[in-house]
Amino acid sequence: IRLTGGEPLIRRNIEQLIGMLAEIPDLDLTLTTNGSSLAKKARGLKAAGLNRITVSLDSLDDKIFMAMNDVDFPVAKVLEGIDAAAAAGLSPIKINMVVKRGVNDHTVADLVRHFRGTGVVVRLIEYMDVGNRNHWDRERVVTARALRDAIHAQWPLEPVAPSYAGEVAERYAYADGAGEIGFIASVSQPFCGGCTRARLSSEGV
């Protein structure tokens, strides 16, 4: 089960909800967050039964990050939360970076470099259409293949087999042993036909 939002960490008693879900035997329980409250909540989340966490972080550049996500907190706050999650024992930690041509594509290498060798797994995601809320433009899409080729040219990569059927990210290991990176081709190679997931809203539908 993956808890998502909006921002799930602003939900009252999120730790209580996680604790109730954690009582289900053999459940892999994870959560996706923007990281704004993670520094103060990481230990409580782990204690409640959360196994791992994914943090949305589209750039290490404050101006770009805040503009893309319409937030008023800096990248440093997110990085503090990631460090707190690691210290609390949430593992693995994954970073989701949505890449938009002409917006943050020039900052991809900086973000990848920052997390290489830390155990944190960066996943580069094609900018996709989510309805009329993000003013989607195909010209803004940087394909997963182009991203992979660019990363491979700087840090050689080796493919990693999927860990389960229907895994959406193509996984690669750094040839020098500095960890793993993933690429999600949500536009150029749609995977909806093989989806193994169901989404449940907060209203239960």
Question: Model-derived features: where do they sit?
Answer:
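Auxiliary Fe-S-binding modules of radical SAM enzymes
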Residues: 110-117, 123-205
